């Protein structure tokens, strides 16, 4: 096969390749078998017309497009292999020559994977982070657990304070007219939680059960409902009940309520300390990894094709839709609730996608620069891990992974990250 690759502007180039007559004949034969099944020709049973009769009635050229559709995936794949290019998008294929009895000549406009110009990626300075759990961190966690065990107790003849939970009716009015979605009865609200627009909860502080009040507010300019954004409104409220948190003492009894596997507060503290220490070490390691990768990416230069960003954004959108589905929502409902559009969401996803694409390209380039290749032992170990995780046999995992290209790529990137981490300097 004759193949010619001409690099053009950016990451786009022109690939010229041929389909020789022997291959063309094979494609025409396969196309005829496919087309013949659908033909009704007088004098012949459906699907039984001879090739010679077909050519006489319709001409062999009638098979050219079907033959090309059959041959193109195979010959294009062979052409890009021979040219040594790595396409990142579906090509635009053009027919240059398709004459009877001659070699077919095709060209394709191909967007290829960009070259990465690496900057410094070894010996990068990163922040030195404390990994030891502090007394304050342990006490904060214990306080949270203590608060979760708190009971709400009705406050008698006392004003509402931040942290209290109030039961109230409210109705919102704009220009004296009640607006949609601005009313509720016997609504439970924790003051200071920030559930309502700024100012609403603050103006409930100091009221007592049975009090009624008019609360004058202005909706934020960025509020999702356009008819209310930046508009002055009045909420008529009536407090029915005020409840305050009654926090239990931090003692052995509470420790047993929090974790039935412990008998004393000291045992609970020890167990929580171990969990928090492990979590902190993991968090510090993750932060270090993110920082060193970000610096290596910042130091690199790469012209990213928009096609790669667009595909990655599509991938993120699909994941987003799956996450919504797991919560019992659809994208349409989400857009309705938030006032956002699918186009705006995709544009937002493209910003994240561009960062992810550049990061992966840079890490792949580092792996190549370091001549990183996963060993058979590492591949087998990863397959064992996946088999255990998904409850599958190793052979089944191997079959599902096919040529292992994705697994090998993942392992190479992990090793590239190790290169960054091992050489990083904490300061």
Curated annotation (Swiss-Prot):
Keywords: Cell cycle, Cell division, Chaperone, Cytoplasm, Isomerase, Rotamase. Pfam families: FKBP_C (PF00254), Trigger_C (PF05698), Trigger_N (PF05697). It comes from the Bacteria. Residues 163-248 form the PPIase FKBP-type domain. PROSITE patterns: FKBP_PPIASE. Its EC number is 5.2.1.8. GO terms for molecular function: peptidyl-prolyl cis-trans isomerase activity; protein folding chaperone; ribosome binding. It catalyses: [protein]-peptidylproline (omega=180) = [protein]-peptidylproline (omega=0). Its main location: cytoplasm. One of its GO terms (cellular component) is cytoplasm. One of its GO terms (biological process) is cell division. SUPFAM superfamilies: FKBP-like (SSF54534), Triger factor/SurA peptide-binding domain-like (SSF109998), Trigger factor ribosome-binding domain (SSF102735). Belongs to the FKBP-type PPIase family. Tig subfamily. Involved in protein export. Acts as a chaperone by maintaining the newly synthesized protein in an open conformation. Functions as a peptidyl-prolyl cis-trans isomerase. Consists of 3 domains; the N-terminus binds the ribosome, the middle domain has PPIase activity, while the C-terminus has intrinsic chaperone activity on its own. HAMAP family: Trigger_factor_Tig (MF_00303). This is Trigger factor. The gene is tig.
């Amino acid at each position: 096969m004759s193949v010619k690759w001409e690099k053009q502007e950016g990451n786009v180039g022109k690939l010229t390749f041929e389909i020789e007559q022997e291959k063309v004949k094979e494609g025409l034969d396969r196309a005829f078998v496919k087309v013949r099944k659908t033909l009704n020709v007088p004098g012949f049973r459906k699907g039984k017309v001879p090739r010679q009769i077909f050519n006489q009635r319709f001409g062999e050229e009638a098979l050219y497009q079907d033959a090309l559709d059959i041959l193109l995936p195979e010959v294009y794949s062979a052409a890009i292999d021979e040219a040594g290019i790595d396409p990142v998008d579906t090509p635009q294929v053009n027919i240059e020559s398709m004459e009877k009895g001659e070699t077919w000549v095709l060209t394709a406009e191909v967007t290829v994977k960009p070259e990465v110009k690496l900057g410094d990626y070894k010996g990068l300075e990163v922040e030195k982070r404390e990994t030891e759990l502090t007394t304050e961190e342990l006490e904060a966690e214990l306080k949270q657990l203590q608060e979760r065990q708190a009971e709400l107790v009705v406050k008698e003849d006392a004003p509402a304070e931040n942290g209290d939970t109030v039961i109230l009716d409210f109705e919102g009015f704009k220009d004296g007219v009640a607006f949609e979605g601005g009313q509720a009865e016997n609504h439970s609200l924790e003051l200071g939680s920030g559930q309502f627009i700024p100012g609403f909860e603050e103006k409930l502080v100091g009221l007592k059960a049975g009090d009624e009040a008019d609360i004058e507010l202005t909706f934020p300019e960025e509020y999702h409902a356009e008819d209310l954004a930046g508009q002055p409104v009045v909420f008529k409220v009536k407090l029915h009940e005020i409840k305050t948190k009654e926090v239990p003492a931090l003692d052995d009894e509470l420790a047993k309520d929090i974790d039935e596997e412990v008998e004393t507060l000291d045992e609970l503290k020890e167990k929580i300390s171990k969990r928090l220490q492990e979590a902190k070490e993991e968090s510090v390691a993750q932060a270090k990894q993110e920082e060193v990768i970000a610096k290596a990416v910042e130091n690199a230069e790469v012209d990213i094709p928009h096609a790669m960003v667009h595909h990655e954004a599509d991938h993120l959108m699909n994941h987003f839709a799956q996450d919504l589905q797991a919560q019992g929502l659809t994208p349409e409902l989400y857009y309705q609730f938030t006032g956002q559009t699918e186009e705006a969401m995709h544009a937002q996803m493209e910003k994240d996608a561009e960062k992810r694409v550049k990061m992966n390209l840079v890490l792949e380039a580092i792996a190549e620069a370091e001549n990183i290749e996963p060993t058979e032992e590492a591949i087998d170990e990863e397959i064992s891990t996946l088999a255990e995780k998904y409850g599958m046999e190793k052979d089944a995992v191997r079959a599902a992974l096919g040529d292992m290209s994705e697994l090998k790529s993942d392992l190479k990137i992990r090793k590239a990250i190790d290169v960054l981490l091992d050489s990083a300097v904490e300061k």
